UniProtKB/Swiss-Prot annotation:
GO terms for cellular component: cell surface; extracellular region; phosphopyruvate hydratase complex. The lineage of its organism: Bacteria, Pseudomonadati, Pseudomonadota, Gammaproteobacteria, Cellvibrionales. GO terms for biological process: glycolytic process. Pathway: Carbohydrate degradation; glycolysis; pyruvate from D-glyceraldehyde 3-phosphate: step 4/5. The active site is at E209 (proton donor), K341 (proton acceptor). Keywords: Cytoplasm, Glycolysis, Lyase, Magnesium, Metal-binding, Secreted. Its cofactor is Mg(2+). (2R)-2-phosphoglycerate binds at Q167, K341, R370, S371, K392. This is Enolase. The gene is eno. GO terms for molecular function: magnesium ion binding; phosphopyruvate hydratase activity.
Length: 429
């Protein structure tokens, strides 16, 4: 009854108004699963390929009809008749049919949408929540935890049209006892921050991920205004709430130097390590993502040596959810955490492999959205199913972000004590 009988694909819109792929997998039992592929703005050069049409007369060249057609023909013919419970076999069949390292023939957006839709259909057929099915696939049934949300409340870089160089300034409610309490703390900080920015005469429009995007005199000023919001909300910095950065350094790495144009400062790699180390010493920053360019492995080693014993150093563009690259990073003791994005690698099975490799090596795994999202909430189930312990899914507004938080609230209500919220203990520092 779990045999695939039909697969359909559609061109739909993401949260930025750009086309993306939705896939629907129908099983013999009548069970249906649907999923959408997300899309990134600041992307690693070694990510799996998001197949776009390039036809400038439609969606400024960003249409995905080719990827949709690949699902409705090649992938459908490949998978109809196969068992949706055998996720690894489905993913392998699509990967083999594509035949490239970066999924450039069928498109990572096509393969991923079908991969996730098949998992959802299988969960429906089994009459279990998606997180339970993913935990079964992961070989960790019943071993759940609720993730600490890393809430991006000030946006800069590629995620906003402002002069702030660092892409994300985040808060983590590590002192909360439950996910629901953590979400409330984050929301209260968010609303206090909005009032503070408004009273300063600063812009309270939001960026791609729902965070505010004001022009500020420096990156450090973003931290200072967040600290005021935390205190105004009635919480203790460093105890109830900690801070995190996503530098997205590849976006301002030029000719071997880190150019913070918004501040008019240029750093060598070693100097930028010292800059980040200084911020981590001055403020309770417990996580820094992409603190170095994806190609600056010597710089990554330097940063890891300087602060890796007390700060979680997350590789996003560095590792692109790819086990081959992650393995090399682990061997060279580069970073101590990996950001997990489905569409960087392009299938559920490969995503689970990356999480397992990280956890087995003592690295943390942070489950993440993309800046171009949809109403799809699969990452919430993934975070709980793999006991990853951390999730990045934006700020406390925009339904493309809040939908993931709301899904996590429902999961926590279902699981109760079977999915503990561990707070500060989840971080590599």
């Amino acid at each position: 009854m779990t045999k695939i009988v039909d697969i359909k694909a559609f061109e739909v819109l993401d949260s930025r108004g750009n086309p993306t792929v939705m896939a629907e997998v129908i099983l013999e039992s009548g069970a249906v699963g649907s999923a959408c592929a997300p899309s990134g703005a600041s992307t690693g050069s070694r990510e799996a390929l998001e197949l776009r049409d390039g036809d400038k007369s439609r969606y400024l060249g960003k249409g995905v009809l080719t990827a949709v057609n690949n699902i409705n023909t090649t992938i459908k013919n490949l998978l109809v008749g196969k068992d949706a419970l055998d996720q690894r076999a489905l993913d392998k069949a699509m990967i083999d049919a594509d035949g490239t390292d970066n999924k450039s023939v069928l498109g990572a957006n096509a393969i991923l949408a079908v991969s996730l839709a098949a998992a959802k259909a299988a969960a429906v057929a089994k009459k279990v929540p998606l997180y339970a099915h993913i935990a079964d696939l992961n070989g960790t049934p019943g071993k759940y935890s609720m993730p600490v949300p890393m809430m991006n409340i000030i946006n800069g870089g590629e995620h906003a049209d402002n002069n702030v160089d660092i892409q994300e300034f985040m808060v983590q409610p590590v002192g909360a006892k439950t996910f629901a309490e953590a979400l409330r703390i984050g929301a209260e900080i968010f609303h206090n921050l909005k009032k503070i920015l408004h009273d300063k005469g600063l812009n309270t429009a939001v960026g791609d991920e729902g965070g505010f995007a004001p022009n500020l005199p420096s990156n450090e000023e973003a931290l200072k205004v967040i600290i005021v919001a935390v205190e105004k909300a009635g919480y203790k910095l460093g105890e109830d709430v900690t801070l995190a950065l996503d530098c997205a350094s590849s976006e301002f790495y030029k000719d071997g130097q880190y150019d913070l144009a918004g501040e008019g400062k240029v750093f060598s790699s070693a100097e930028f390590s010292d800059y980040l180390a200084d911020l981590a010493n001055k403020y309770p920053i417990i996580s820094i993502e992409d603190g170095k360019d994806e190609s600056d492995w010597d710089g990554w080693a330097d940063l890891t040596n300087k602060i890796g014993n007390k700060v979680q150093l997350v590789g996003d563009d560095l590792f692109v959810t790819n086990t081959r690259i992650l393995k090399e990073g682990i061997e060279k003791k580069i970073a101590n955490s990996i950001l997990i994005k489905f569409n960087q690698i392009g299938s559920l099975s490969e995503t689970l492999d990356a999480i397992k490799m990280a956890q087995d090596a003592g690295y943390t795994a942070v489950i993440s959205h993309r800046s171009g999202e949809t109403e799809d909430t699969t990452i919430a189930d993934l975070a709980v199913a793999t006991a990853a312990g951390q999730i990045k899914t934006g700020s406390l507004c925009r339904s493309d972000r809040v939908s993931k938080y709301n899904r996590l609230l429902r999961i926590e209500a279902e699981l109760g004590a079977a999915a503990p919220y561990k707070g500060r203990a989840e971080f590599k520092s």
